[in-house]
C-alpha cells in the first residue's frame, strides 16, 4: 500500500499550474525547433528553396527560429526536470519515504522510451540524454544550496574551458563518433552527395528511413559531446533542483 501511494501520480491539487504551463511551452518550443527538419525544408539546397514563392518569408522564419527558438527551450526543459526531481524528493520526505528507488524506476522508463525513440524514430531525441544525466542527480541530494549553485555554475561555464582544451590539444572527445556514422551511412548507400535527397527519392519509405536512422545515434552523440551539451544540461538540472528546493 505504501509503494502504491508513493508511486501514484501527483494530484492536480498538488501541482503548481505555472510549472504545467512552462512544460507545455517547453514542449512547444522543442517541436518548433524540430519542425524545420520534420518538414524536409532543411534538406533542400538553397537553389531549390529559391523556387518557392514564400522564399523571402521562409528566410525571415528561419532567422526567427534560429534567434528565438534553436537551443533555447532545452534549457527550460532541463530546468523543469531539476524542479521535478526536487518535487519527488519533497513528496517522499513528507511521507517519510526514500524516493531514490522511485526516481530511478522512472528514469529507467524514460531511458527505454528514449532509446527506442533514438534508434528507431528520430536521431534528435533528448530523452535518453536526460535519463543518463538524471541518474547523477541523487548524488547531489545532500548538497547545501550553496554547493548546488557552485556545481551548477561550474558545469554551465565549463564548456569555455573544454573548448580551450580542444583547441590546445587539437582533438575532441567526440571525434571518434563521426567516422562511425559516416561508415554506417556508406554501407547504406548514403553519401555526401546524396544525403539531402536520400529520403525523398521516388518510392522511398520505411526502409530508407531505417537506413537513414541507423547512423543517427553516432551523429547525435557526436553533436552532444562536441557542443558540450552534457555539462550544460546537468548544470541546468542542478539550477532547477535548487529552484525547486527554494520553491522559487
Predicted stretch roles:
Residues 2-83, 88:
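N-terminal signal-anchor module of multipass membrane proteins
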Residues 12, 16, 51, 55, ...:
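Membrane-helix interfacial "entry" motifs
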Residues 31, 157, 237-240:
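Hydrophobic residues within the alpha-helical transmembrane core of Major Facilitator Superfamily
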Residues 34-41, 160, 164-171, 243:
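Transmembrane helix-loop junctions and nearby membrane-interface residues
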Residues 53-59, 105-110, 210-214:
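Active-site-adjacent bridging/hinge elements
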Residues 75-90, 128-139, 228-248:
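Specific transmembrane alpha-helix
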Residues 86-87, 91-166:
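Internal alpha-helical transmembrane segments
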Residues 154-235:
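Long hydrophobic alpha-helical segments that form multi-pass transmembrane helix bundles
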Amino acid at each position: 500500500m505504501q509503494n502504491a501511494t508513493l508511486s501514484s501520480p501527483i494530484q492536480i491539487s498538488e501541482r503548481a499550474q505555472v510549472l504545467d504551463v512552462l512544460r507545455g511551452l517547453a514542449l512547444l518550443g522543442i517541436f518548433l525547433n524540430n519542425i524545420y527538419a520534420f518538414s524536409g525544408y532543411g534538406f533542400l539546397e538553397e537553389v531549390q528553396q529559391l523556387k518557392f514563392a514564400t522564399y523571402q518569408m521562409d528566410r525571415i522564419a528561419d532567422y526567427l527560429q534560429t534567434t528565438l527558438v534553436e537551443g533555447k527551450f532545452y534549457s527550460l526543459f532541463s530546468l523543469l526536470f531539476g524542479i521535478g526531481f526536487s518535487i519527488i524528493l519533497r513528496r517522499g520526505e513528507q511521507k517519510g519515504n526514500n524516493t531514490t528507488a522511485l526516481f530511478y524506476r522512472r528514469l529507467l522508463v524514460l531511458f527505454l522510451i528514449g532509446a527506442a525513440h533514438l534508434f528507431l524514430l528520430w536521431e534528435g531525441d533528448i530523452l535518453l540524454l536526460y535519463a543518463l544525466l538524471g541518474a547523477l542527480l541523487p548524488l547531489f541530494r545532500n548538497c547545501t544550496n550553496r554547493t548546488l549553485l557552485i556545481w551548477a555554475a561550474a558545469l554551465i561555464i565549463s564548456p569555455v574551458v573544454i573548448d580551450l582544451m580542444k583547441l590546445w590539444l587539437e582533438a575532441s572527445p567526440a571525434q571518434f563518433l563521426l567516422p562511425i556514422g559516416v561508415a554506417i551511412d556508406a554501407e547504406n548507400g548514403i553519401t555526401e552527395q546524396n544525403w539531402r535527397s536520400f529520403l525523398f527519392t521516388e518510392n522511398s519509405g520505411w526502409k530508407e528511413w531505417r537506413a537513414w536512422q541507423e547512423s543517427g545515434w553516432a551523429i547525435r552523440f557526436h553533436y552532444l559531446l562536441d557542443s558540450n551539451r552534457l555539462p550544460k544540461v546537468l548544470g541546468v538540472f542542478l539550477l532547477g533542483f535548487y529552484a525547486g528546493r527554494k520553491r522559487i
